[in-house]
Amino acid sequence: PDWKQTFEPHPAEMLFDLEKDPDELHDLSAIPEYAETLYKMRQALSDHIRTTHDLGFFLPNSRTGHILYEKVRKEKYPLDELYGLVEIAGTATVASLPMLEKALASPLPEMRFWGVVGYANLARENQINTCPQALLALLQDENPYIASEAAYAVVYLGKAQEGIARLITPAQEKDRKIGYSSLECLSLDPEMRDYIRPFLSELKEAAENLPRLANEDAGLMARGILVNL
């Protein structure tokens, strides 16, 4: 059914004819006759990101304590390198692994994050099936967004116990919702639900005892995960 599309994984690129399909239900990106249109729009977007020095690919906590616009210019942040990595991460193939592996070791958190995203996409698409140690090590990254994305990725690479345990138990309580967000994505995948079920008691306790009034309260998120299971 059409409504289900919102809750299913999407490719990095989708193309819609908004005149004929205003609800964006029919993706045209894989249809050969639209290949030229897709290429032109991809290039236009790529150019726009670079022309505007888009900061939308930075992690939410990268904006704390300073003005990000000023920081990236003062420190001469390698924005072009970041943009290239982001574009690769969404459409990664095994040929992209050297770039992704390099990103995992970067001192810049955004590079590590998008490197992990690339691995996660490869893993979910079954293009790779072994978990590199560098990726597993990022479960302990000091940045909760990186640790959460790494946990999501390793679940698809034979490390379900380690990954889900990391999402269930944050390093700091204030970061619980970040892990739950990734866990909710996993719970929407029927093939992942059996790996999550051993943690039902922890999720039930969270659903009963954590705040659950606002939309993104951890208790409410735990309830949503339980419903998916």
Predicted segment positions?
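C-terminal, low-complexity/hydrophilic appendages and adjacent surface loops
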Residues: 1-30, 36-39, 68
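Extracellular/periplasmic ectodomains of large secreted or surface enzymes and adhesion receptors
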Residues: 7, 39-40, 48-51, 60-102
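Non-transmembrane alpha-helical segments in soluble domains
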Residues: 16, 25-29, 42-49, 101, ...
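Cytosolic regulatory/linker segments at or just downstream of nucleotide-handling modules
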Residues: 54-56
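Structural detector for internal amphipathic alpha-helices that build alpha-solenoid repeat scaffolds
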Residues: 77-94, 110-126, 145-159, 177-194, ...
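Amphipathic alpha-helical scaffolding segments comprising HEAT/armadillo-like alpha-solenoid repeats
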Residues: 93-105, 125-139, 159-171, 192-208
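Short coil turns that connect the paired helices of HEAT/ARM alpha-solenoid repeats
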Residues: 104-110, 139-145, 170-177, 205-217
